[in-house]
Amino acid sequence: MSPLETNPLSPETAMREPAETSTTEEQASTPHAADEKKILSDLSAPSSTTATPADKEHRPKSSSSNNAVSVNEVDALIAHLPEDERQVLKTQLEEIKVNISFFGLWRYATKMDILIMVISTICAIAAGAALPLFTAPSTFQRIMLYQISYDEFYDELTKNVLYFVYLGIGEFVTVYVSTVGFIYTGEHATQKIREYYLESILRQNIGYFDKLGAGEVTTRITADTNLIQDGISEKVGLTLTALATFVTAFIIAYVKYWKLALICSSTIVALVLTMGGGSQFIIKYSKKSLDSYGAGGTVAEEVISSIRNATAFGTQDKLAKQYEVHLDEAEKWGTKNQIVMGFMIGAMFGLMYSNYGLGFWMGSRFLVDGAVDVGDILTVLMAILIGSFSLGNVSPNAQAFTNAVAAAAKIFGTIDRQSPLDPYSNEGKTLDHFEGHIELRNVKHIYPSRPEVTVMEDVSLSMPAGKTTALVGPSGSGKSTVVGLVERFYMPVRGTVLLDGHDIKDLNLRWLRQQISLVSQEPVLFGTTIYKNIRHGLIGTKYENESEDKVRELIENAAKMANAHDFITALPEGYETNVGQRGFLLSGGQKQRIAIARAVVSDPKILLLDEATSALDTKSEGVVQAALERAAEGRTTIVIAHRLSTIKTAHNIVVLVNGKIAEQGTHDELVDRGGAYRKLVEAQRINEQKEADALEDADAEDLTNADIAKIKTASSASSDLDGKPTTIDRTGTHKSVSSAILSKRPPETTPKYSLWTLLKFVASFNRPEIPYMLIGLVFSVLAGGGQPTQAVLYAKAISTLSLPESQYSKLRHDADFWSLMFFVVGIIQFITQSTNGAAFAVCSERLIRRARSTAFRTILRQDIAFFDKEENSTGALTSFLSTETKHLSGVSGVTLGTILMTSTTLGAAIIIALAIGWKLALVCISVVPVLLACGFYRFYMLAQFQSRSKLAYEGSANFACEATSSIRTVASLTRERDVWEIYHAQLDAQGRTSLISVLRSSLLYASSQALVFFCVALGFWYGGTLLGHHEYDIFRFFVCFSEILFGAQSAGTVFSFAPDMGKAKNAAAEFRRLFDRKPQIDNWSEEGEKLETVEGEIEFRNVHFRYPTRPEQPVLRGLDLTVKPGQYVALVGPSGCGKSTTIALLERFYDAIAGSILVDGKDISKLNINSYRSFLSLVSQEPTLYQGTIKENILLGIVEDDVPEEFLIKACKDANIYDFIMSLPEGFNTVVGSKGGMLSGGQKQRVAIARALLRDPKILLLDEATSALDSESEKVVQAALDAAARGRTTIAVAHRLSTIQKADVIYVFDQGKIVESGTHSELVQKKGRYYELVNLQSLGKGH
């Protein structure tokens, strides 16, 4: 049964009142874990969105990118509303807080899973218990003392050897079963969590998404579920095995001889105390280090998210210095942390060697007193050695468990949330027959994500069945809100929405949405074929289960109706063409027509068209418009339109202004009334006669997709679910200028680097630390000698204890000496381990700091096109700075030191063994490669498991993210079940393939564990034979045996660094790639002519431009424009027509594709970039302030640090903010908070203007500098801008025309060209495009 048919709310959660919601992380169990969680969540949080060129032109209605707001904040924001309205908003936002125990992670385990886990647990414990049973060497002593004959000895020996072989076989079986079992149940449980999570996400109301941000869902479904899987898979088995080893070893020791075991346990207490004390410091220091990195990360995030600002002002160096302050701080704490770690490891080795000394010394006393025999002493010592080693294997896994619990708390919180608008619910009635009459009664609406804005106030509106109602009005007047309320995406805070007189609240939500088809302004297609995309329109309708032929007929008819059939059949694969993720392989007009076909295919009763033709050019719009009019016949249709010509035939036209109805009637009635609507019509009518189709426009459809595929570099290659890349090759009839040039550009390639290149590259970061490196490496060699020395001492001690009773006085003397030697080795180990730890600590922390600071500076060096790419989003780059640099230290000194240490151990062990007894040494050496291979395979497999499961889930995660990021489309198509079933099928397929690889790789892992026993058996058998023939004494036997086996095992641990080294290699390649990338427009470049002065004459000559990330969309099409020195020039036009692009090209954020831009007659691409930009100042729509004081923020306007006070004051006075600053208690030293959050919009904007004026620019660029302000602040800021423009060449982009009436020249843009120019009064008299814009705006003001 799929989770869809069950309710994930268990009775006890359903009974509970939804808890007050907050997003604190109480679940993270230790302060350290909590801290890491915080950093992780900070990294994964979707970064604050800055306007990329793409969304500058289309800003979504609600872009609150902050993650789930806590309840107290929500309460504060809605406090001004009446109680019932508050309740409506709260239910749409409410979150549940869940507390989870570790066992709660198996919430969805089936009976089968539990059975497998029980078996795996038993096996894991058995596998752990086998290791200490290793300890049975008493036979040797009896033969040394000639107590038994050779034959008797040989029988005993064979028994012992067989005992090891059986243990090995047992180990193989138990390890195999427990590894496979835990990995399988871990994957299975996580798969269920993923399915329930997606199901729950698809259930949630749209308001919840507005607040959540798609990034959050992506993080949960990818990173967080991986953390859970990590915490409940093989690590559970490894931990149980280690604990079992520890317990068994100590039981054996105490059973054999409790007094000696008790004395040896005392050092374990010392060890625990040392570790505990040390870890307190480690937690403290790493918290401080993480805090500093966090603060640095915030700076990096602020700077990268406002990169245009930093680039325009040339303040990269200043900002990089601010970042480096935090890095230095982090380095200081990080170094302390690593040094403490080094001392802890040193203390651990020191105590362990002292423990051997103590054990032998006490053992010799007990032996002489006759209290115990030699065999028991050896057993106790071996057992304690093995037991204390295994305890070290538990701690690394503990972190994985706490992370898993913390990650699950958030995910289960969403799963348990009951959506107020649940599309899965069967509640509510369905109507057998309805006409389609829609009515809004006294509706008041507020978006949950923006509770401070009332979008609609007391609107009553009747939309008769079978008739077309059109909504017009300025943006933000509430047109799209009507659509959102009819679709029930939101609940109105007051009033009702009725369908045929039934309150839609009482109707079943899924049924309601199935009766309605929606075509929105920016149509969303899914990453599948055109056929399947149109077929999505049939989900839940009476045609859903028709025969395939009938469905195909319906789909083709719908495509013909939407004027899409012809272009679809012209594609090589026709209807089976894959459209790519979100349909990016098609042009805007093609996507729009497929969306229309999808909407009409099910013959819906109600059709909602939200600016359905806005993405089309004039030619295709006419055809589609005719199609829509045909489609609207006989249905209730609601049309939102900007172009009034498209709604002339509507039965009723409703003019909305500021959330209220201004006037309504038919086209003729409204024109006769002579109100606002008539002015609009006149303005538009005049224009439509004047408009001539632009060259690029007429053939926008024919811009070949082959060209697009060429420009789109590998970065956006979309692939189908089975992994085949999808592109459309189609030859076009005619290319525009810019696409012709773009198609000649070579595609970007990704360089590959050899391991040696990367090692040299990483080493270059550590060049100044070479003395520390040398100290570290020398002490690593010394530390590596500890193990071989210990083996000699061990063998000496054993042969001493084997002396017969007659030599007890010699025994006591020798035992004292060798015990003392153990103690000395312990002290030496403490010194060498601590010293190399400290030396490498300095190296690796400095490496991380240098890498971060260099990377940050290199990122700031890049051109703006680099930041427009999706893979270089603010979040991605900040996380690259924090995680990849950490990985880089995987090939720094510490790892090299460890490798050197273990190589020394192995080398010394082999030499000593060969010197003392070459026969046995050679036999033992023959198994070393096998042991090493086992060690290597073990870690290779673990690394494979992890990377495999990450990769496997990327495909399905992408699918889930595509669905959640276009949740409105999924909801309006009622595709929730369909999406869930595809996701479920993908996870199932992954589960099957991963099971096969788990079965294979666990086989290797289990073999590697069992081989250790077989190798021991071989050495034991051959050594025993030599002993029996009295060729070797017990000393030679034990030296060779323990040197090589222990040496090889410790050498095997080198491979535990393999995953780190793998990550480090990838990280180094990423860094190298970044450092090798030379931006086209290079901020560091000294080339080009440096300017002494600038007059300020500007000219654009036939400039063509497309954004590198959207090469299919021409933005400027042959722009010609001149500005005289000192002129105030305004650029106006509808959104997306290229105004802001003109400013970006002037700042040289991008280079034009064709044509040239001249300042004072010089081509700006030939000038020195920094010299040129120093004469410009930019004030943009969203003022950018950084953490710090007002003064620091203003000083960012210039490169120099020391500015005379009077310049600063003059800039502030000109910006109309000086008085305000002086009124603050701290004056210029007032802290502005993150992103300037402590100041209002108007205050921030004026600080930004002061910063721009401090440069004393010759050219001032204003990009909608007042559009984000309310009318009060707008006046003040506008006055400041007018003052600032005196005596300078000023170019202003404006949405509010009232702000530019005084301009010397106004250029009117449309579709990337200038259609009119002149002064305000000239243009108004022309009654052209400008006149229409003026009327549109006065409509908004007049009511």
Swiss-Prot record:
Q: What is this protein called?
A: ABC multidrug transporter atrD
Region entry Disordered: which residue ranges?
Answer: 1-67
**What PROSITE patterns does the annotation carry?**
ABC_TM1F, ABC_TRANSPORTER_1, ABC_TRANSPORTER_2
**Mutant lacking the gene: phenotype:** Leads to the cellular accumulation of fenarimol. Leads to increased susceptibility to cycloheximide, the cyclosporin derivative PSC 833, nigericin and valinomycin.
InterPro entries noted in UniProt? AAA+_ATPase, ABC1_TM_dom, ABC1_TM_sf, ABC_transporter-like_ATP-bd, ABC_transporter-like_CS, P-loop_NTPase, Type_1_exporter
PANTHER family documented for this protein? ATP-DEPENDENT PERMEASE MDL1, MITOCHONDRIAL, ATP-DEPENDENT TRANSLOCASE ABCB1-LIKE
Low complexity composition-biased segments? 20-31
Task: Tell me which residues make up the ABC transmembrane type-1 domain.
Answer: 115-403, 774-1063
Enumerate the spans annotated as ABC transporter domain: 438-683, 1098-1336
Known function: Pleiotropic ABC efflux transporter involved in the protection of the cells against a wide range of toxic compounds. Confers resistance to the azole fenarimol via efflux transport. May also be involved in the secretion of penicillin.
TM segment ranges: 114-134, 163-183, 235-255, 263-283, 339-359, 366-386, 773-793, 820-840, 887-907, 920-942, 1010-1030, 1037-1057
Task: State the family named in the UniProt similarity comment for this chain.
Answer: Belongs to the ABC transporter superfamily. ABCB family. Multidrug resistance exporter (TC 3.A.1.201) subfamily.
Conditions for induction? Expression is strongly increased in the presence of cycloheximide, camptothecin, imazalil, itraconazole, hygromycin and 4-nitroquinoline oxide (4-NQO).
Residue numbers binding ATP: 473-480, 1133-1140
Q: Which organism is it from?
A: Emericella nidulans (strain FGSC A4 / ATCC 38163 / CBS 112.46 / NRRL 194 / M139) (Aspergillus nidulans)
What is a GO molecular function of this protein? ATP hydrolysis activity
**Activation and inhibition:** Fenamirol efflux transporter activity is inhibited by the cyclosporin derivative PSC 833, nigericin, reserpine and valinomycin. The effect of reserpine is transiant, while that of the cyclosporin derivative PSC 833, nigericin and valinomycin is proportional to the time of exposure. Cyclohexinmide has inhibitory effect only when applied prior to addition of the fungicide.
